[in-house]
Amino acid sequence: MAMPFEIEVLLPGELSPAETSALQKCEGKIITFSTLRHRASLVDIALSSYYINGAPPDTLSLLEAYRMRFAAVITRVIPGKLLAHAIGVGTPTPGLFIQNTSPVDLCNGDYICLLPPVFGSADSIRLDSVGLEIVFPLTIPQTLMREIIAKVVARAVERTAAGAQILPHEVLRGADVICYNGRRYELETNLQHRDGSDAAIRTLVLNLMFSINEGCLLLLALIPTLLVQGAHDGYVNLLIQTANCVRETGQLINIPPMPRIQDGHRRFPIYETISSWISTSSRLGDTLGTRAILRVCVFDGPSTVHPGDRTAVIQV
């Protein structure tokens, strides 16, 4: 009979009573493992396990690690060991709960993603007796995750441009701000490693070039139809008025008219272009962002989970 995948994290005997008590308060928080084993050590979940060539990770490095590593929820801390259940491996754990480690509220039904600390101080615990530190990922709603990822990648592009003297250092923007559920939050991203920034920018530029190419050809093919419908449809008329730059640029390009029949044998059939464009946008989100691993599922009690509170979840 299939069972939940339980992991035993062995705790060193050098831990002080205060550190053991602090670990017990971490029940419900999420940790990640580079490999799945039924028995692991405390070093496997410490911040040092994320180091790259001996250097501490930055925001993009942690984000990439969360995409590649296996997540698990701390279910119990007993003398000598820490018990955790892996997410997405084995049968779902009945009665699973997590602790909201983000500064934003979680609502019933929210899909939860893992993000690095981007709101200033990290949710972490220091174990000075063994020289280790554990940094817990943030439990962020998927809807908010998309906006945060966009701002982090945009900030990485800005830092890279400034470092390459493409953009003067004096014109760097201030801190990024997001609003969620009527509250204002300030993002503090840590971007130190060029590898993570370069990989994100390379992915962004490649997808951007492909999307612009497909989108311009699609728009040029649809302009005659939009011009005809603009006199009758207010939405289409507004769309045409807001696309003056693209239309003026398109007038400089002499592209032969495309046949109306879509038989799939030409390079840029309209509906195939639409499908390819949508698929590209989806892949870009999957490449830069992170997937949801849990969903808030509250049957009784308040539907809003405040920071630091615990809530029941189901695996997705």
Curated annotation (Swiss-Prot):
Main localization, broad class: virion
Species whose genome carries this gene: Varicella-zoster virus (strain Dumas)
Protein name: Triplex capsid protein 2
Keyword Transport: no
Lineage summary: Viruses, Duplodnaviria, Heunggongvirae, Peploviricota, Herviviricetes
GO cellular component, one term: host cell nucleus
Swiss-Prot/TrEMBL keywords: Capsid protein, Host nucleus, Virion
Gene Ontology molecular functions: structural molecule activity
Primary role: Structural component of the T=16 icosahedral capsid. The capsid is composed of pentamers and hexamers of major capsid protein/MCP, which are linked together by heterotrimers called triplexes. These triplexes are formed by a single molecule of triplex protein 1/TRX1 and two copies of triplex protein 2/TRX2. Additionally, TRX1 is required for efficient transport of TRX2 to the nucleus, which is the site of capsid assembly.
Location relative to the cell: Virion; Host nucleus
Family: Belongs to the herpesviridae TRX2 protein family.
Quaternary structure annotation from Swiss-Prot or TrEMBL: Interacts with TRX1 and major capisd protein/MCP.
